[in-house]
Every structure is written in structure tokens, then in C-alpha cells.
Amino acid sequence: MKPQYQIHPFSGEASEDQLQSIYDLNQANTPEVGSLNSMAHLKQLIDLSAYNLFVLSSKEIVGFIICMREGSSYQSENYKFFSQRLKKFLYVDRVAINEPHRRMGLGQAIYKDIFAQASNNDLPIALEVNTLPLNQPSLKFHEKMGFDRVGVKDFDDRSVAYFIK
């Protein structure tokens, strides 16, 4: 039987249990998403964010996305890449789906909501994907979803490709 999923927006008013689940899911998906050093770090990201969703299956959080708008005080080098190039944008800081729930259309469902949010506000969507270590599934997914590669950057310990749609 195929699991039932519900997608819900969330903010800093999410419950401690929900935040813990999101934190745990984030940490389980590193290095595909950046590691968070504490729950306080997650709460800080959420306070800086503009639009967030989590996915429930049988009352368990199995996916999430955290997005920022332009003008945030977020200090990520990747966020700054887009801040220096775009006047308005919706930045996908991190998205993760629990392994057993991948390839079931959840990524497309989450992005359908993000596309609607961006369209309603006339915003391009900006994000980066790791190329070192290589996150091939994410590269393929975002290219399939219509994102265009607009740049690359090498850091000391990793490299990323930048995308806009």
C-alpha cells in the first residue's frame, strides 16, 4: 500500500518534536545538505527563512524544505552568490527527504508548492547543489525540474553548482 503524504507549511512556531524531527532528518542527509551544529542553528535558519514546508507520512516528518528571500541577514556564501546577482529571489537553503520515501514524487510535490509560491510573488528560485562531494541525484532532479546552471564555486572542502529557475 502506497503511503499517504501531507505537505504543511511551518515556521518558528513548529513544535519542539517537529523541529527535532527536521533536525534529525537534516543530519541524516549530510553531506547532501549542510550539517547543522545544533537545534539552535536550525531555529536560527527558520527565523531567517521566508517559506518552509514539511512532509508528513503517518504522523512522521519524512521531508522538508527551508527557503529564504532576498534581503535576509543569512551569512551563507551560497546565499550571498545570489544576493549579489538578483534583486528578488526565493533561495532554497536545504531540502531533504528520508531515504525510504525518495522516488515517490515527494520532491516534485514540494517543488510544485515552491513554484507556486515563487510565481505568486514573481520570483526566480535559486539554489545550489554539491558537486564535490557529488550529489548526482540532486543534479539530475533539479535539471529535470527545469533549473538552469548559472555558476560554480570551489570551496576548500567542497564545490557547488548554482541554479536558477
Annotate each predicted stretch with a short phrase.
Residues 1-40, 60-62:
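Short amphipathic alpha-helix that is part of the acyltransferase structural core
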Residues 50-69:
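Conserved beta-hairpin
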Residues 66-94:
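Conserved acyl-donor/pantetheine-binding loop and adjacent beta-alpha core of acyl/acetyltransferases
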Residues 93-103, 131-132:
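A short, internal acetyl-CoA/4′-phosphopantetheine-binding micro-motif in the GNAT/acyltransferase core
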Residues 97, 103-116, 144:
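Conserved acetyl-CoA-binding loop-helix of GNAT-fold acetyltransferases
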Residues 118-131:
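Conserved GNAT acetyl-CoA-binding A-motif
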Residues 132-151:
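Conserved active-site alpha-helix within GNAT-family acetyltransferase domains
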Residues 152-165:
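C-terminal "cap" of GNAT-fold acetyltransferases
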